[in-house]
């Protein structure tokens, strides 16, 4: 891109657990400017929904990583989307969660919020998991009562007139997954049509 005088930037979706400030600085030098990190509510709920493989909690490590970046990086050219997947058992604690966000992140415009309901996207096998799914009425209630949290320039772009156009249609958009697979779409991961090769195998 530099040789051809083309602008380049990248974004990553990460659980944030290993996103230390030192790792962030290395990524920033590589023009990774957009990050999506999931925080599923306060510690008690997040640590029940998003645990390590060995069952260890993750909330404190992720929050401390985010705060280290927030407090030490002065660049305005980065964006953090804090995604929250609301399950039924979170709906009674939204106010408390908002107070937490206000305390640590709402004073920094680089941090945006993206709220979704937990749902079945085709991989759920047990009824126990289905019991935490929210309904469309729950999402409607969430948006109507917390509009000021939900609406920001990120969600406006996502749900605006152009937001419904799949970014896989863009000629200059590619996905590189954790295994080095090169794809266009971040959702249709099993389709061979969505697979262009592998770094180090088909591409240097």
Role assignments for model-derived ranges:
Residues 1-41:
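Conserved SAM/AdoMet-binding glycine-rich loop
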Residues 16, 119-121, 188, 202:
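Short, solvent-exposed coil/turn elements at secondary-structure transition points
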Residues 17-19, 86, 118, 199:
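Hydrophobic pocket-lining residues within nucleotide cofactor-binding pockets
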Residues 20, 45, 201-204:
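Short, electropositive, low-hydrophobicity segments enriched in small/polar residues
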Residues 40, 44-179:
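Radical SAM enzyme [4Fe-4S]-AdoMet core and its adjacent flexible, acidic
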Residues 188-204:
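Membrane-interface junctions of multi-pass transporters
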């Amino acid at each position: 891109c530099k040789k051809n005088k083309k602008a380049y930037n990248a974004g990553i979706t990460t659980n944030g657990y290993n996103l230390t400030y030192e790792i962030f600085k290395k990524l920033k030098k590589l023009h990774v400017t957009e990050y999506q990190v999931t925080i599923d509510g306060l510690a008690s709920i997040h640590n029940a929904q998003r645990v390590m493989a060995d069952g260890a909690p993750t909330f404190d490590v992720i929050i401390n990583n985010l705060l280290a970046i927030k407090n030490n990086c002065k660049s305005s050219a980065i964006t953090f989307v804090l995604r929250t997947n609301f399950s039924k058992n979170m709906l009674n604690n939204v106010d408390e969660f908002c107070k937490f966000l206000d305390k640590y992140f709402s004073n920094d415009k680089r941090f945006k919020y993206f709220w979704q309901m937990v749902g079945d996207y085709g991989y759920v096998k047990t009824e126990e998991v289905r019991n935490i799914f929210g309904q469309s009425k729950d999402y409607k209630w969430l948006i109507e009562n917390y509009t000021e949290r939900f609406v920001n320039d990120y969600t406006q772009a996502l749900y605006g007139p152009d937001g419904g156009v799949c970014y896989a249609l863009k000629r200059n958009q590619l996905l590189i997954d954790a295994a080095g697979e090169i794809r266009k779409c971040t959702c249709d991961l099993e389709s061979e049509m969505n697979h262009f090769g592998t770094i180090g195998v088909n591409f240097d």
